[in-house]
Structures are given as C-alpha cells and as structure tokens.
C-alpha cells in the first residue's frame, strides 16, 4: 500500500472522520464503522484532505482533465481544496464546479451551478466523500451531461465501503460504473483500512482490535461484495 494511503487512513481516524463501534446507517443497516466527512473543519485538515484527493486523482486519472466537480453539499469544499492542491502539487490549473440543491434565480451567477461554467469539450472528474447508494450520482450525472457536451473521466471518493448496494449484489461504485460508463475509484478501500489499522496503535490506542475486527468480518459476511 502506498505511503500516502497509509497516512490518509490515520488522518481520517485522527480527524474523527472514521469511527468504529456500532452505528445505524440511513439504509437501516447496523455497521461497525462510520465515516463522516463533515468532521473535517479546520484549515489544516482541509488542506491535507485536498492533497490526498489530488494525489489519488493524479495517480488514477493523470492530469488530462479540466474540471473537478463536487456535488452539493459535501462535494463543494472537497472540489475547491482539491483544485488548490492539484495546482500546488502538479502545477496544473483545473477549475471547480458544483451544483446547487436549489436553483438561484437572480444575480450574475444565477442557475443550477456554482463555480466554473461547464463548456463543450470539458473533461470532468467527479469528487465525493463516500458513496453508499449512488443516489447523488443519479441526480448529478444527468445535470452535468445536460448542460454541455462534456466527458466524465471518472469518480473519486474517499472510502470504498466495499458493500452491496440496496438493489443487489454489486457495490454502489460498481453500479455507477456500469450505469454511466465511467471509472469509479477511492483513495482507500475498507479492506486497506482494516489491513493497516488492525492491532495497530493510532493516537495512543488500538483502533481495530480483535472485537472490532470480528464485527467487521461479520458485517461483510452479510453485506460484503464479492
């Protein structure tokens, strides 16, 4: 596993973004882990978050793209900090764009989008925190493709939970890839998280001990993707 991925896993734990215990998800599933990207709240955290996304995007998709698109709401700050980090790390100027939940009907920037306008020929990388159902892409992809003749290069999320979507045996990322025809990737997978944190001390404690590891294993026996 690359060094930046190991650092990112520990960064999520240190930032209180990735937690282990017992959580009820929106789907109703009882999960032994939970990720909340809304816990990134400081300037230094957001700066580092952008750098991790930029590294993963550069490694996966290169720099042949024009726009980073972050769906509202959590995708907005992620797309902004990643655009800054991409320029700082790779000297590449990319634009950011996001959609609005409610269309703005006044001012110079009225409409359904904020940030850069999408143009014919743009190559777009989508950014999200985590995708469990694919619902946000269901809403966003038609918007993006409907406003201009763009190419969606791929999607990058923080964490691939590696579990079945609500509609079948495939993960949300697999379903998105098959439905919309672009690549889907994550900075890290849950398998990599467990591999790195199991019986490892982080912030003075073992984050994934035998009990939590057993709970994760049981969860994936029921909900894991092949």
Language-model regions, residue ranges each:
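PRPP-associated nucleotide enzymes
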Residues: 1-127, 132-226
